[in-house]
């Protein structure tokens, strides 16, 4: 899946919380659902959608499933956003250099 699917998945506030929690490592559904204002089945549904979009992957640990972030999909989003940063930083660099050069021309020589 592309960065669009990942961004769509991350637009949901509950899924954003799940991603934040998974930053610390793999977790079972029960731990992920703890303290959320949605039911455990709702969290399971969110995780299925996230898995389908490639945001998380599941590994079996005995009788339970552990969910963990799939950094590949998040890396696609980072690469997409980097294009905007690259353009913005180039503009900032150009503006700073122009301002510096204009300042040098205005200063009286000693």
Language-model segments: residues:
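C-terminal regulatory/oligomerization modules of transcriptional regulators
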Residues: 1-2, 9, 21-35, 40, ...
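Short, hydrophobic-biased segments on the C-terminal half of alpha helices
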Residues: 47-48
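N-terminal beta1-alpha1 ligand-phosphate binding loop
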Residues: 8, 13-14
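Pre-recognition alpha-helix immediately N-terminal to the DNA-recognition helix
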Residues: 16-18
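Short, Lys/Arg-rich nucleic-acid/phosphate-binding segment
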Residues: 60-66
């Amino acid at each position: 899946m592309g960065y669009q699917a990942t961004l769509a998945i991350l637009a949901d506030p509950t899924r954003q919380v799940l991603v934040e929690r998974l930053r610390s490592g793999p977790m079972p559904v029960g731990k992920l659902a703890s303290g959320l204002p949605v039911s455990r089945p709702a969290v399971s549904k969110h995780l299925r959608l996230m898995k389908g979009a490639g945001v998380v992957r599941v590994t079996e640990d005995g009788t339970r499933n552990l969910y963990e972030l799939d950094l590949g999909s998040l890396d696609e989003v980072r690469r997409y956003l980097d294009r905007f940063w690259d353009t913005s930083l180039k503009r900032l660099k150009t503006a700073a250099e122009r301002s510096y050069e204009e300042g040098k021309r205005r200063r009286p020589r000693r």
